[in-house]
Amino acid sequence: MMVFQSFILGNLVSLCMKIINSVVVVGLYYGFLTTFSIGPSYLFLLRARVMDEGEEGTEKKVSATTGFIAGQLMMFISIYYAPLHLALGRPHTITVLALPYLLFHFFWNNHKHFFDYGSTTRNEMRNLRIQCVFLNNLIFQLFNHFILPSSMLARLVNIYMFRCNNKMLFVTSSFVGWLIGHILFMKWVGLVLVWIQQNHSIRSNVLIRSNKYKFLVSELRNSMARIFSILLFITCVYYLGRIPSPIFTKKLKGTSETEERGGTKQDQEVSTEEAPFPSLFSEEREDLDQIDEIDEIRVNAKEQINKDDEFHIRTYYNYKKVSENLDGNKENSNLEFLKIKKKEDSVLWFEKPFVTLVFDYKRWNRPNRYIKNDQIENAVRNEMSQYFFSACQSDGKDRISFSYPRNISTFFDMIQKKIPSFRREKTPSDKFSTCWSLINEEKKENLKKEFLHRIEALDKEWSVEHILEKTTRFCHNETRKEYLPKIYDPFLQGISRGRIQRLVPFQIITETYIKNNIGRSWINKIHGILLNINYQKFEQTIEKFNRKSSAIEKKLSYFFDPQEEKLNSEEEIKIFKFLFDVVLTDSNDQMLSKNFLDVHEIHKKVPRWSYKLRSDLEELEGENEETIPMEPGIRARKAKRVVIFTDTEPHNEIYTNLKNNQNYDQNDEMVLIRYSQQSDFRREIIQGSMRPQRRKTVIWEFCQANMHSPFFFDKIGKFFFFSFDIRGLTKKILRNFMWKNGKKKLDKKYEDKSKRKEKRRLEIAEVWDSFLFAQILRSSLLVTQSILRKYIILPLLIIIKNSVRMLLFQIPEWSEDLKDWKREMHVKCTYNGVQLSETEFPRKWLTDGIQIKILFPFYLKPWHKSKFHSSQKGRLKKTKDKNDFCFLTVWGMETELPFGSAQKQPSFFEPFFKEFKKKMKKYKTKSLLVLRFFKERDKIFAKEIKNGILKNFIFIKGKRNDLSKGNRIPLFDLREIYELTETKNDSITSNPIIHELSVQNRSMEWKNSSFSENKIKNLIDRINTIRNQIEAISKEKKKITNSSNKTPYESKIIESSKKKWQIVKRINTRLIRKIFYFVKFCLEQLSLGIVVGIMNIPRMTTQFFFESTKKILDKSIYKNEETEDKITKKKNTIYLISTIKKLISNKKKMSYDICSLSQAYVFYKLSQLQVSNFSKLRAVLEYNICGTSLFVTNQIKDFFQKHGIFHYKLKEKTFLNSEINPWKNWLRSHYQYNLPEIVWARLVTEKWKNQINQNSLVLNKSLNKEDSYEKNKFDNYKKLNYLKADSLLNPKQKQNFKKDSIYNIFCYKSINSKEKSFDMPLEIIIDNFLVSSFRGKSNIRDIGEFRTRKYLEWRIIPFWFIKKVNIESAVDTKSQKIYIKTQVQNSEKIDKITKMGLANQKSLFFDWMGMNEEILNYPIANLEFLFFPEFFLFSSTYKIKPWVIPIKLLLFNFNEKKNLNKIITRNKNGFIPSNEKKYLRFYNLTNDEKEKQRNPQLALPNQEKNIEENYAESKIKKRQNKKQYKSNTEVELDLFLTRYSRFQLRWNFFLNKKILNNVKIYCLLVRLKNPNKIAISSIERGEMSLDILMIEKNLTFAKLMKKGILIIEPLRSSVKNDGQLIIYRTIGISLVHKNNHQISQRDKKKIEKSITQLKKKTVNRKKNNYDFFVPEKILSPKRRREFRILICSKLKKKSTRYRNSRFDKNIQNCGQVLNQTKYLDNDKTNLINLKFFLWPNFRLEDLACMNRYWFNTNNGNHFSMIRIHMYTRLKINS
């Protein structure tokens, strides 16, 4: 029952999944989504449904709904029907059709009333109103929707349509889904309207009651047409904003042909010497395609070719036609070519259709960002895909392949174009699949038979010629042996087809190399047929053989038809003969180059924008003015070019050869770019593009100053209803509560005030920049104000002042005032404030703007103080510095900064007020003395009067006491009575208390005083009455309490509560009494705590700082566990830096990677220890060595066992070869992806990589026994001679078999039972690593042209530039040669190679990267690298396989010659751009080249020398047009950057600001005759920094680094990784074994050979003679692949199933996969025999062919490496 229920449940789940993934459900879902795409058609639909009434209204509703549904149905049909989709999806459809229709509808119905159309039944047919409603809803439904864009849904449809099989069902279901959603939406709208009408509360609350309600409703209904017209107008405006206008859009100019043909005039001169076309090495190779297109248009009857989708063959076949017309005259041919080109341009412009003229699909209609590439000027378009889709036959069926070879498709298309009679008829898929399978079966059987016959012949010991399959040739006549030439035979491979020579890097190509190699490229004759250079002659030749085009079509189809038919007719022989006659070459297999210049490979044109754009900033900079078009196309930030200094004087210390340069400008200008202060709304937008379509820029304010992205909306100051933030309010309250400090409030207030001032200043600057003629007006006003101030206002004030002094009989101060007036300087500045001079105006100062800076401004003073007094006072009093400069405003005021607020000028009358205040103080001091005298006299007089009064008062008091002795009053009794009354709680009034207090007071003060008897009697009576009342009240209360029902328990509660209240009352009184002392104690403790905390702040901060720095350093050391951090310090540092240095030095001792140490080194150190007892190490060694027994050699284990350190016992190994072995062959076949560690580090995380290294990296000498076994196992087999065919082979044949045998050994290793580490040919690993490291063949973009290192090591930098090399340059003005003399000095200071403890050992490899060395003295550029080590340079402790790099390579560049003179010749025409693409060409080797190939070591020194010279030459020439070197430091820095290309130099940020400030002062000081005063004042103000003033003319690179001026930073290069690399590295994780990172003794010599032989990767392979024979070698390689694929196409299924845990695929195999038994290793001899006999069905190198042939992987869904079939691993008994 349970099984049945689970079965039902599983079926239900699967059924639900099928329903969800079905086409119908997906279509319904998509259709329901399209309901929310609301467009203008809904306006008409709602209008018809809401407003129209009556019979006509019903008809309109029906017509509107019908048109709406019909329009949507057309949209869905357009998904399936391609022509309709293209018509509706064009970008110009809406512009041409939708906008005029919208505008017509708006203006036509705008003046009409909604209900007054005047329609009757008679004119119904004439007006066609119902039909118009239908058309409106139909047409508007076809327009793009704007509330929810339909582009997203269209992409979903396209994706699903590509995957869907039943496309019509999908379209139908999506339409039904839309219809359901539309009905639901309309019903919802109707329900909402009905609810609004029926709900009285909404109408009563929202609308006005009484008669006004009806009036408003009628007005709303009458104005409904106007409302809809307004909505339509808004829609039109919206579309106008989103659609590019064809008329007003700026048309960008395409690149001119003269610019495309070459980079410079010199290159064009070189190219025109050979032909009227550009040379092969022109700068813009892709620009030649336009010439090709024009030529092809001419040949193909001017048919239009799409430049983005068409493949071309690069050729210049019109050169022959032109030269024939002009009898070979080259000059006339040039003229003729240009004439033809001009004619073609005019004709092409006329023939362009209207759509392409109005709508340029290559124009930047959308605001895309222009990404400029220095190598390829034109930007690549985004439409380029990395995949190529085409239909192909796979598994006998037509399928769409995303990885179809594009060259095959192009070749087939070219044949169809060039030979119109050729067409292929499509056969039905069923017939083709059956035919395909039958053909494969037949081929397989034939190959089986042939293979068996050859094996039988092998058993019969026939000769090798009859056994082995011979090479297949493309033959015309077998009897005559007429073959296709070897160089063009497609069946041949290798050297017979010619060697593909990869040219030298383009940066080292010289002019002589170009002249020697132009015209040496051969032409592919088969391409020549397809190109049909002389098309008419080609057609006539075809007609000679047969005029029937149908026969030609039938016979030529044999090249491509999969059916096998024999060609026996005469026509077929004629066709083949014709082909061979055309293609046949001369006897020397060389092509005459008089007719053609060159033909390149077939290529796919990358779609690029046809414009070379530059920004406004590049135009302002003025660089490369000749090679850049005039008008800028990129709108950069608003800026202006300001010349701040013009150097007209020649300098002798600069290169003198610059005088002879024609391009040298004698007036060297220093230019600054001035940016506008306003917000950058352009953001490098391209002219002509639509700014409203821009992403990430939204304007939500009416007047928005700055551009913001919506992502930062929460960071921007918002409106009140957006800015209610509870969290922010709580923070503000807490901050104000905690920090009630007046000083901080003042600081914040001052900061806010300064921010407001800066904002206002920028707003004023924006206003001046925004208006058209504002700068002209402002500049003229400033100059006028300057003249008025200097020459009119100030002299007039001086005259008035001195004349008034003369009238007041005072001495005039003419000389002092005139001296101050002359000291004032009006310096003309640029708009940014760069000072020029008093008389020199900046260029274009009227339009660009100007600033006038007043130095030492003149202020009128009423009098001048004496010099001695003022100077002495200034020395004694150090007041704050006063700014002795200001900027002039338009209104003649003074301001501190340009466009700042006017500052208050010192008043003329201020000294008067100061003097008046001083005199008033003097008068006050004198008057105070008089007042003090009178005050003292008043005090004495008052004291005497007081004493007399007191004496009289005492006398009177004594007399009264005597009189009142006889009549005393009993005050104490009264006091007692009233104290008793106070205890009563039921007293009603407070009068007795008051009287008692009054009596008490009197009795206390006047004890002896006598009262009248009447008053005493009254008091006694009152007391008695009150006492009686109290007694009466108490009696009444007792009666009440006795008569009540209260329990004694409640009375006790009341009494207890009273007691508690009394206790609380006492406590309160006590607290009130003691609160003062408590508060005082708290304040004292708080102040004490604050003082202690303030005293502990330095200790806590220093402790926290050291802890944080320690954590940062620990983190950096952990991240770089494989490297040793070399952190260098400056000398004479502060104490803080020295403490950090100690911390680093302590940490560096523990930062080495233990995995990188060798076993020999570790155990050698252990053996040197003077310790006899290893008890402490025994546990560690037993655990580590026993746990990692696979990675410790047997010799070391035996050594420890003999010495009794521990007893080691072999454990059972647990590695699973069943998962590893199927991948080994594939990994070894892709050895080129075994990249260096620095590239591998980019694919995995650092922590994960460290774990893998700790588990898998092995020590250097781990497998000597296994290595010896691997070395000799095939030599042992050679002696056995198990196969008799071995003896039949000749020595030459054995040599040929050796190549395949080296590759075959990897396949057989997978069958070996011995569990061993992953092994690869060591030459391949080392050669791949070293050659890619030092020839630039890495996979990092744009670095391939440099011959650089993998990283920059700090110890090498001072070796090249600081200590050991001095670069000196001399200039020869006549020959224009630069001699750079490089002299190696202090070579004995090279760091020691041998280490302590290892000095007696001889080893080729040494610790050249400074392991176990503590470096503390090397300079560091900036301390920020200390705290952020991730930005530090690559460290130098065993970074990239240091055990592979020998001493010879380390000292390769500078150890051969100590004095090396490089002569670099500068030629005008020798510059070759670095962005030229590589191309392939065929050639035949000469004897000299063959000799160099045989002995590459002979050619190596010359090659190295040429590379170095040409490399430096190209780098210097590349910068020749941009800048000229003026000092040795520039040459040194450029040389540094060229050698270490993956690093860049930058200077400090603060230094940049200081240098700019210094430049501004320099510009003024240079123009002054006596600059001392200005210089001193600028230094005092802090405008000019003395620390960056360079006293030396040529600072070395080391000094710049030490001063912190230059900082080295590594470049973050982008990596291009292909799919195979990632797959290789992913699979290789499980196969990282010790042998991958080790070098045995047998391979040391081969490592040296692989290092020196840089051109060939695998010249010296292993010297083992693998002369074993396998049956597979009988067949040729091509037939071998075919045989494997045919055998594996139908594998027999067996019962054994193997689950691959790595990819989770169920695989059917032919038997047990790699049985894991340790007893299989007993009989290794028989296993080796079996290994040589067995051979795999196919190799992994044929994986691509197998995928397309059988595994059906063209769509990429069924790709799996584990489908590979393996033979059974048999068990051999001894």
Curated annotation (Swiss-Prot):
Predominant location: plastid
Transmembrane segments: 19-39, 68-88, 91-111, 133-153, 176-196, 227-247
The keyword Transcription regulation belongs to this UniProt entry's keyword annotation: no
Coiled coil feature spans: none
InterPro entries: TIC214
Record's GO cellular component terms: chloroplast inner membrane
Record localization: Plastid, Chloroplast inner membrane
Stretches with biased composition (Basic and acidic residues): 254-268
Membrane topology recorded in Swiss-Prot or TrEMBL: Multi-pass membrane protein
Family under the similarity heading: Belongs to the TIC214 family.
Subunit structure and binding partners: Part of the Tic complex.
Biological role: Involved in protein precursor import into chloroplasts. May be part of an intermediate translocation complex acting as a protein-conducting channel at the inner envelope.
Protein name per the record: Protein TIC 214
Organism of derivation: Aethionema cordifolium (Lebanon stonecress)
Gene it is expressed from: TIC214
